[in-house]
């Protein structure tokens, strides 16, 4: 598991530095362009995130062992696929570095050997990896598995959107491009669902529990985040002189506050039950910081999408115009 965390941390740092470089040095603005090469780094990151959570379940409960192994194979395979897409020149992108066919063939052969060999070993040895027990009731284990399914679904969405133009070109179906509308259509509801189950998993126990018991612990955070989100959105609309209610901003605030409040509730529960040692644990601190970081990311993406205004104008030197009431 430490190796998974190290790999995930370096991949996260690489994506963050790449985004910072593109934003400040190139002046592109925005937060994500769904470029094929950007997607090539996002896919292993999503799978590695799922792998971190599934490995914690395997470590603590001894379950979903085969699933964890499959995620390990998928994470490394998608890393190799990303290298192939960037270095072979099969995809058109401003981030692509090479168009050498020989290098592309070598990377494709290496990808086939590693992926094929891993799946071959798994097919013949996977049956020996037995789980200790199955999930019983509404536990944190079950919720982490659900989040795993959502992360894998997001990876498949990105994979289809990235490779479909390539497959279409190979089959002579014409050159097409898959843009942000496709990814936004699938990613927005999936991310909201991910935030919901993330908050519920933070408030659930590893031991057997039921849905009603978990709901009792999250009912107060749920009421607070709903009331606070509605108030904040109305306040933003009034002070920005824009009286059109933004549902996307409301959903963003609800998701973000839900994550923060359920984390606070989890910390409060541990303090109340005198589990201070767990709070000081590096694993718990890392989880808390990572979830807070994801909440901030959702906040930035959601609000920039809800309140941004773009217009294409023809202007002459010295002329001015008004956008959203500002000159």
Each predicted region: which residue ranges?
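Hydrophobic, small-residue-rich alpha-helical packing segments that form membrane-like cores
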Residues: 1-88, 92-111
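Contiguous transmembrane helix-bundle modules in multi-pass membrane proteins
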Residues: 36-42, 93-323
């Amino acid at each position: 598991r430490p190796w998974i965390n190290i790999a995930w941390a370096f991949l996260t740092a690489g994506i963050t530095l790449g985004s910072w470089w593109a934003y400040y040095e190139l002046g592109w603005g925005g937060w994500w362009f769904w470029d094929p090469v950007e997607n090539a780094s996002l896919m292993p990151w999503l799978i590695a995130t799922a792998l971190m959570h599934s490995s914690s379940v395997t470590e603590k409960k001894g379950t979903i062992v085969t699933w964890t192994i499959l995620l390990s194979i998928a994470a490394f395979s998608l890393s190799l696929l990303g290298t192939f897409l960037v270095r072979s020149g099969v995809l058109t992108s401003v981030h692509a570095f090479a168009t050498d066919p020989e290098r592309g063939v070598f990377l494709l052969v290496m990808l086939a050997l590693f992926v094929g060999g891993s799946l071959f070993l798994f097919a013949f040895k996977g049956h020996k990896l037995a789980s200790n027990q199955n999930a019983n009731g509404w536990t944190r284990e079950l919720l982490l598995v659900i989040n795993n399914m959502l992360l894998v679904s997001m990876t498949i969405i990105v994979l289809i959107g990235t490779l479909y133009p390539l497959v279409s070109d190979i089959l002579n179906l014409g050159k097409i491009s898959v843009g942000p509308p496709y990814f936004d259509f699938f990613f927005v509801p999936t991310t909201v669902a991910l935030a919901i189950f993330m908050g519920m998993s933070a408030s659930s126990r590893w031991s057997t529990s039921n849905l009603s018991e978990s709901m009792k612990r999250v009912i107060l955070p749920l009421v607070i985040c709903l009331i606070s989100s509605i108030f904040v959105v109305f306040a933003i609309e009034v002070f920005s002189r824009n009286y059109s209610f933004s549902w996307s901003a409301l959903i963003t605030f609800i998701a973000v506050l839900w994550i923060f409040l359920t984390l606070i509730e989890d910390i409060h529960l541990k303090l109340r039950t005198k589990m201070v040692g767990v709070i000081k644990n590096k694993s718990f601190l890392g989880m808390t910081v990572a979830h807070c970081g994801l909440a901030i990311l959702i906040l930035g993406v959601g609000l920039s999408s809800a309140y941004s205004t773009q217009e294409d104008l023809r202007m002459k030197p010295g002329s001015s115009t008004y956008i959203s009431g500002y000159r």
